[in-house]
Amino acid sequence: MLFRSGGWGLYSTAQDYFRFAQMLANNGEFNGTRILSPRSVELMRAVHVPDTLPGRTPGAGWGLAVRVVTDNALRDTYLSKGSFGWSGASGTHFWVDPDAHIVAVLMAQVPATSLRPDFETAVMQAFVK
């Protein structure tokens, strides 16, 4: 029996990925259509695995299918506490910052290296004064 990674083989356009992120930002609703219940989004965004466990990223906990910023100073990010999102292996990245009312999507096919934090910084510096 062959088991593949849960994210392997998933494809999307940048526009649809943005719509997905916007739906999460709107507590499960997109263009007047309910996709997920507000409770489902709340559970996704809640920290279920804290950063205090060994091997975890300081300042970032894990919700259900998203990483959640728990301390932006420890994470060295401009994103607000409570921001959430996910990154793919080949350079895709999205996040929602509810406090700043920002949804951002990065679609790249390059190793992640510093591209993701540089993208976060550029977007937040452009929109948050």
Positions of predicted regions on the chain:
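Catalytic loop of the DD-peptidase/beta-lactamase superfamily, centered on the K-T-G motif
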Residues: M1-K129
